[in-house]
């Protein structure tokens, strides 16, 4: 956008008078990387946060916009979703390092009144349509229309708790890092200063004991403190809540990225245990753990990666965390773990984490763009984690990008083949139902499906399912709906939205339905997978 690109959005704010104490320090646009500047103030960010739509802003800027019920239109024409805010610790660290290298002062938070003045001026000066006033309900974190019932939630968390209780290998079997020093020269540095802690509630004896070990100068104390935290939170729900404090979380943020395998592994396992309780899930994510968990997933030890995948699964169960975890980049490393992890449990947890993330539309698109569909279809062919993969494919088939990728990837033939392989085996009942569910989702409002299903011989196997004495009523109901689609629902070309779409295509081609019926079988225009 030339020289007007970065500051065009708020170019007027330089004319507002402000004292040095209220106006944040300004850095030359030619020297400061664009991504370090808040899109609203145009200044170096002191406390960067990621919003739900993926952009990074100064925290106070987001707070002002939310308080004024205003969603700014950015210079690229987009309007950010301010419903969720998560600290961008990686960006903050990068900015501070950049300042140190360039011998610049660290950025200070802008004055609230100054930012409010900037935003209000923007609201008053923009032409109609350039900004967007929104209702409070649009700014507050969204609530899913079809949220999981308590029984569903309890079922999922019961599985995670069971996994946590059985996952702890003997702590003495964990290898110590060969180069581990006996002592550190400094104590563990958390993101809080001692003065910050003075305003916190007093510690319980249990928390104080763990806290003292985690802040010790001795690495062995760190290990012992983490092992104690891990064991204490493994099965006691009350303790999991009481020990999920800002103090402990701050120390865990430092320890989870430790270069010592045993420290990193026990820190990750402790996060899994703490995340089991619903009140802790939002707290952990809002404390900035997701980027750290992703880093460990990409480059940590094998056992630490396994625990991190379990933590992401547990955190993704919470509705308000799904968007944030997706925005911060968990999808691709989870897909890699699903495909390549040596641990069966890690692969299963990765599939479940991705399933819960895919319950919201934005994450479905991320999965499709990351190449999830061909990868998962390949796994279905080889029989890997079939039931859970099929659940994921059901979700992806619900979005247009996913449905298109599945049809292009020969999903109908693969799914029908999977049904034939499973037969009526009780052991494959879940996979069969998920397989039929995926086919049903693909069939909805899609003209290509009928031809592809016919080529794959779907009608025969689906008829067997409906007429079989075994199988659940839900399975038979889904199969019946697909058969109705294949048989035209009382009309050769179907009814409703599909028929209307078909007629529009025929009219656009200059053909009538009768012309198509007469000539379509002679090679000119076949309703098949080539369509």
Swiss-Prot record:
Gene3D superfamilies, per the entry: Leucine-rich Repeat Variant (1.25.10.10), Zinc/RING finger domain, C3HC4 (zinc finger) (3.30.40.10)
One protein family per Pfam: Arm
Taxonomy, superkingdom: Eukaryota
Ranges for region Disordered: 167-205
Catalysed reactions, semicolon-separated: S-ubiquitinyl-[E2 ubiquitin-conjugating enzyme]-L-cysteine + [acceptor protein]-L-lysine = [E2 ubiquitin-conjugating enzyme]-L-cysteine + N(6)-ubiquitinyl-[acceptor protein]-L-lysine
Enzyme Commission identifier(s): 2.3.2.27
Pathway(s) this gene product operates in, as recorded in its UniProt entry: Protein modification; protein ubiquitination
InterPro entries, sorted: ARM-like (IPR011989), ARM-type_fold (IPR016024), Armadillo (IPR000225), Ubox_domain (IPR003613), Znf_RING/FYVE/PHD (IPR013083)
Keyword Transport part of the UniProt annotation: no
Ranges occupied by ARM repeats: 237-276, 278-317, 319-359, 361-401, 403-444, 447-488
GO biological process, one term: protein ubiquitination
Enzyme class label: transferase
Key words, A-Z: Repeat, Transferase, Ubl conjugation pathway
A GO MF term: ubiquitin-protein transferase activity
Low complexity: compositionally biased ranges: 190-201
Biased composition (Polar residues): 180-189
Residues covered by the U-box domain: 31-105
Its biological purpose: Functions as an E3 ubiquitin ligase.
Name by which UniProt lists this protein: U-box domain-containing protein 39
Organism: Arabidopsis thaliana (Mouse-ear cress)
Gene giving rise to this polypeptide: PUB39
């Amino acid at each position: 956008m030339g020289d007007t690109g970065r500051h065009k959005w708020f170019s007027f704010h330089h004319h507002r008078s402000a004292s040095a104490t209220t106006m944040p320090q300004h850095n030359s646009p030619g020297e400061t990387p664009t991504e370090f500047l808040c899109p609203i103030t145009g200044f170096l960010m002191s406390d960067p946060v990621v919003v739900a739509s993926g952009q990074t802003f100064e925290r106070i800027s987001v707070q002002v916009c939310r308080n004024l019920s205003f969603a700014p239109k950015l210079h690229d024409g987009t309007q950010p979703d301010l419903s969720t805010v998560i600290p961008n610790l990686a960006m903050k660290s990068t900015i501070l390092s950049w300042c140190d290298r360039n011998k610049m002062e660290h950025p200070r938070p802008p004055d609230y009144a100054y930012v409010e003045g900037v935003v209000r001026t923007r609201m008053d000066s923009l032409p109609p349509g350039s900004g967007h006033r929104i209702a409070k309900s649009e700014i507050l974190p969204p609530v899913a229309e079809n949220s999981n019932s308590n029984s569903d939630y309890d079922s999922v968390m019961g599985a995670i708790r069971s996994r946590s209780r059985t996952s702890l290998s003997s702590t003495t079997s964990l290898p110590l890092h060969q180069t581990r020093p006996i002592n550190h020269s400094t104590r563990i540095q958390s993101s809080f200063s001692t003065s910050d802690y003075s305003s916190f509630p007093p510690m319980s004896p249990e928390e104080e004991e763990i806290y003292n070990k985690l802040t010790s100068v001795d690495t062995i104390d760190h290990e012992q403190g983490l092992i104690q935290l891990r064991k204490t939170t493994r099965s006691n729900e009350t303790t999991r809540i009481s020990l999920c404090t800002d103090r402990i979380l701050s120390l865990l943020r430092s320890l989870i990225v430790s270069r010592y395998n045993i420290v990193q592994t026990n820190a990750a396992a402790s996060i899994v245990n703490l995340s089991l309780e619903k009140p802790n899930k939002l707290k952990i994510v809002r404390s900035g753990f997701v980027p750290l968990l992703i880093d460990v997933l990409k480059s940590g030890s094998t056992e630490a990666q396994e625990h991190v995948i379990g933590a992401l699964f547990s955190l993704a169960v919470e509705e308000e965390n799904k968007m944030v975890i997706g925005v911060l980049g968990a999808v691709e490393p989870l897909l890699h773990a699903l495909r390549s992890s040596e641990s069966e449990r890690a692969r299963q947890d990765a599939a479940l984490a991705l399933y819960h993330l895919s319950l919201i539309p934005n994450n479905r698109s991320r999965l499709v763009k990351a190449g999830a569909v061909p990868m998962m279809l390949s796994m279905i062919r080889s029989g890997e984690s079939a039931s859970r993969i099929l659940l994921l494919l059901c979700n992806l088939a619900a979005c247009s990008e996913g449905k298109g990728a599945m049809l292009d990837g020969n999903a109908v033939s693969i799914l029908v083949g999977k049904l034939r392989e499973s037969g009526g085996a009780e052991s494959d009942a879940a996979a069969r139902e998920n397989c039929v569910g995926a086919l049903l989702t693909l069939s909805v409002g899609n003209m290509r499906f009928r031809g592809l299903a016919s080529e794959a011989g779907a009608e025969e196997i689906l008829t067997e399912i409906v007429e079989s004495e075994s199988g659940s009523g839900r399975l038979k109901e889904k199969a019946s709906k697909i058969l109705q689609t294949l048989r035209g629902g009382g009309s050769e070309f179907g009814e409703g939205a599909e028929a209307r779409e078909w007629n529009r295509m025929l009219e656009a081609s200059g053909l009538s339905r009768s012309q198509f019926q007469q000539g379509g079988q002679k090679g000119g225009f076949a309703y098949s997978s080539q369509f």
